[in-house]
Amino acid sequence: MTQWSNWAGTATASAQVVHHPTDLDGIVTAVAAAAADGKRLRPLGSGHSFSPIAVADEHAVDLSGYTGIVDVDVAARRVTVRAGTTLRALNSALDTLGLALENMGDIDKQTISGAISTGTHGTGASFGGLATQVAALELVVADGSVLRCSANERPELFAAARVGLGALGVISTVTLNCVPSFVLAAREAPGRLDAVLERFDEEADGSDHFEFYWFPHGDKTLVKRNNRLPAGSTPEPLSKRRQYIEYQLIENRLFGAVCRLQRAVPRLTKPTQRVVANVLSERKYSDVSHRVFVTSRDVRFVESEYAVPRDELVGVITELRATAAK
């Protein structure tokens, strides 16, 4: 048996058999082997889901050896990529082609198949999640058949498989609609929760990508606004020194130390939350899109996400604020 754990350490498994295909035939063979044994087969990505979605106690297929771009249509801004390719590797390859993903989340360690299958998303009212950028999929289903699907070919399968949770088969390739490379201007600044909530609609509609982080037990937030710059704009990233201080020292080492302290001494949670909120500073910079979207995450964390109607958000945050104060 092979021991597996997800990134956050919230799910573990000991699969009886782990397949490591390096080509399409290898994926078909893995599916056939599981079927012949009468066992369930789970695809494994990078383990960045917090739930036990990838837990496999019978057969698992690890696609980390099945990577890379297999086809490019620069004129149509469309690329086909193998399922085990990470978002980081994909972004690097797209850079050389003058292309980019239209939108993405703030982690790039996921495989492309795992990211779309679990509904990975970014921010921005006018931009969808990764699954909305998928033009076509190739899927190995339970009987070993290799099916291609798109909006025009097997549209019902395509609609389901884009966020299929690995339940419909093993994705072998993903064809993505891309956009020309672009530069994002980022403005990140501390703010007061009341002010953010009061201006929420204006802020959300006024930026291509808007989000805020609230620190419970206080009224401080970190507000992030990202906006596309005109084509041909020159990136103006933070200096290497500033990046090291902001991202490595403050957002990872200091934050990690605070988290460990709070777990060891829970009564210090409220005061340390306030300390963390008060060390935030404003920063403005611009860079190639994925370098702005993605944030380095060395501190392991567990996250739950809830979707609420936009016009209910202020009320929900107000209730959470009251609950946290108790």
Which residue ranges define each predicted feature?
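Noncatalytic alpha-helical scaffold of FAD-dependent oxidoreductases
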Residues: 1-326
